Amino acid sequence: MIGRITGLLLEKHPPLVLVDVQGTGYEIDVPMSTFCKLPDIGKKVTLHTHFWVREDVHLLFGFMTEQERALFRQLTKISGIGARTGLAILSGLSVTDLHQAVVSQDSIRLTKIPGIGKKTAERLLLELRDKIDPVAILSEAGAAASNVDKDILSALLALGYNGREVNRALEQLSEGVTVSDGIMQSLKFLSKVK
């Protein structure tokens, strides 16, 4: 398996790039999120790669970050999501945006990606729901900056509320609230919403 490639960037033609590694040129398919971050032609580039083997073709996919590659691997494990669809998803949404869509169960966001219909979006959300840590993702996005917010978030998720409901509840909390008061305020808010 080829896990990473470092070499000279020779060509860029979306979604394909050509990287020269000591005289051998590797054609690598990349999502647009990676393509936009590539250096100029002739510069050194490092890509985290995934080697895709099928009976009729061997393909190399490249990603600027390990998180993109890990998410690509998760996506392609889902029934009906192939490598091209995985690339399309990563081209349409950043890793953080996709994680937020999964946490908030936002299928509309996914259906805006070419090739992703309503059923595929719902299947993606269902399959990825348990594989993504909402606390880590919301922290990345700045939505749960304090430990108090994280504790409230964890408690509400443990009670069975989904990410979208929890986000709305966290947004209405007053500044400097304690964990217990925050949970109580959130539960009151959520009971009115339902």
Swiss-Prot record:
Pfam families: HHH_5, RuvA_C, RuvA_N. Disulfide bonds: none annotated. Keywords: Cytoplasm, DNA damage, DNA recombination, DNA repair, DNA-binding. The keyword RNA-binding does not apply. Residues 1-64 are annotated as: Domain I. Coiled coil: none annotated. The RuvA-RuvB-RuvC complex processes Holliday junction (HJ) DNA during genetic recombination and DNA repair, while the RuvA-RuvB complex plays an important role in the rescue of blocked DNA replication forks via replication fork reversal (RFR). RuvA specifically binds to HJ cruciform DNA, conferring on it an open structure. The RuvB hexamer acts as an ATP-dependent pump, pulling dsDNA into and through the RuvAB complex. HJ branch migration allows RuvC to scan DNA until it finds its consensus sequence, where it cleaves and resolves the cruciform DNA. This is Holliday junction branch migration complex subunit RuvA.
